[in-house]
Amino acid sequence: SGSCTSQVCWNAMPKLRQISEALLKSHIQAYHMMYSKRSLKLRPLQERNRNPSKTDIVYLTPDYCEPNKRHGSLGTHGRRCNKTSTGVNGCRLMCCGRGYQTMLRHVTESCHCRF
């Protein structure tokens, strides 16, 4: 007597929740890279225990400190900054580590006061 057995195999996608959690984890652990003009290679902006693998997410941010006509950036050299601000207009961020000069101006204005 002959018996026949059949085997069916298929691949199934993981649940959407599993996919989204994996993507979120990859996004959070993404490597912020910087292009080194000296070595002509990408290197991580922050030191880590290992270099990114082929499956890790990496990203670049343009250097807004230096002028780049191709990308429409005028750079930050010569612009005024706010010494007390921690935002994008603050000297710490805008001056890109180049330092800055403090300028003190004395302005006399008429306040139209009446006594």
Swiss-Prot record:
UniProt feature coiled coil, ranges:
none
GO molecular function term, any single one: signaling receptor binding
One GO cellular component term of this record is: extracellular region
Q: State the compartments where it is located.
A: Secreted, Extracellular space, Extracellular matrix
Where does the protein principally reside?
A: secreted
Summarizing the function annotation, the protein's role is:
Ligand for members of the frizzled family of seven transmembrane receptors. Probable developmental protein. May be a signaling molecule which affects the development of discrete regions of tissues. Is likely to signal over only few cell diameters.
According to its UniProt record, which protein family does this protein belong to? Belongs to the Wnt family.
* UniProt protein name: Protein Wnt-2
